[in-house]
A protein has these predicted regions:
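Divalent-metal-activated hydrolytic enzyme cores
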Residues: 1-45, 77-90, 95-105, 113-295, ...
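Active-site-adjacent alpha/beta core region of enzyme catalytic domains
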Residues: 48
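Catalytic core of membrane glycerolipid acyltransferases/transacylases, capturing the structured
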Residues: 51-79
Length: 326
């Protein structure tokens, strides 16, 4: 995978569409479908992740979570405002659809940073981690304003993501932070009581459904450290994206550091598109990817054939034209 970044653009595009085809075949397979159904039966909490468009922020990979379990929402810097008309509608629809099926909803509201070099942090906040954390708390308050602060059904959880080691940090209700990078594999058994102390107002079932992500992250951190010790991760912590994705439905990009994914939520879509283009340009200038082109990919998911699919095609064509003209 790491070699694909240096290939000519035509080969990279062919590789990407082959990746999408393989992902689709695997995702639709009986075994994968049954595995997802079993996982959701054991862990019924619906988990959504609000995160930055940065291609290094790949929570399913960092938590060893099967594809199709976590619902992603992406934007520049992880900057969201639930007052945005489209974002508010999408989130409300998601929550109502989950709760009507008897499921609680956990929102992971993420920010990211780098312990090795602040310049590898979040450009959307000018590498100011404190500002990013403050914004996640604002999002948490907005979610509580819309869905209630009792947290019996919808729980907004602030999470940090350290990109050098792909390590999660969980922010508790009293300001305490559980930094998984500071735990060893032998301390995995302590995660459950730590989480109970950290998040006493979180429903028991929801904590039980969050635990597999934390266990998976501990395992992933250990793998990352092994890669680092073998000098296999020197470039992976830096931007190497060569794809700009606009829209939703990019679950097949289950690969870190490949694409900058922009959700269609902000009333000002031009701003994140311009920022994404500047990151791609910087990647080319620094020699991290070839300068022979990049891919702009628009996608809109649909649930039903007929009108829903026709609208999705029209919206995808619009997003493609709009993005190309920015």
């Amino acid at each position: 995978m790491s070699e694909i970044h240096s290939k000519p653009i035509a080969q990279r595009i062919d590789w990407l569409f082959n990746l999408a085809r393989r992902h689709g075949e695997t995702f639709r397979s009986p075994e994968a479908w049954l595995a997802r159904e079993r996982y959701l039966a054991e862990h019924p909490t619906a988990i959504a992740v609000l995160k930055c468009m940065d291609g290094r922020i790949n929570i399913p990979v960092a938590t060893n979570t099967p594809t199709g379990i976590l619902m992603p929402f992406r934007n520049l810097g992880g900057i969201f405002d639930l007052g945005w008309p489209h974002l508010g509608e999408v989130l409300a629809h998601h929550v109502l659809r989950m709760t009507s099926a008897g499921r609680r909803v956990l929102f992971l509201i993420t920010y990211h940073w780098s312990k090795g070099n602040p310049q590898r942090g979040c450009a959307g906040f000018q590498y100011d981690t404190a500002a990013a954390i403050a914004h996640t708390r604002e999002i948490r308050q907005q979610i509580e304003q819309i869905f209630g602060s009792g947290h019996g059904t919808v729980y907004p959880l602030v999470c940090g993501f350290e990109t050098d080691e792909d390590a999660l940090s969980i922010h508790g209700t009293d300001g305490t932070v559980l930094d998984l990078a500071k735990l060893s594999a032998s301390e995995a058994s302590t995660l459950e009581p730590r989480l109970t102390t950290l998040l006493p107002d979180m429903p028991t079932q929801m904590r039980a459904d969050l635990l597999p992500l934390l266990h998976g992250n501990l395992e992933h951190i250990a793998q990352v450290r092994e890669q680092t010790s073998r000098h296999e991760r020197l470039l992976d912590v830096e931007h190497r994206e060569w794809v700009i994705c606009i829209g939703r439905g990019f679950d097949f990009l289950h690969t870190p550091n490949l694409a900058l994914i922009i959700g269609p939520y902000s009333p000002d879509l031009a701003d994140p598109l311009q920022k994404a283009a500047s990151i791609i340009e910087s990647n080319m200038a620094a020699g991290r990817i070839p300068d022979d082109g990049f891919l702009l990919l628009a996608s809109v998911p649909y649930d039903e054939i007929g009108v829903d699919r026709a609208r999705a095609e029209m919206k995808a064509n619009f997003l493609s034209r709009f993005s190309a003209n920015v």
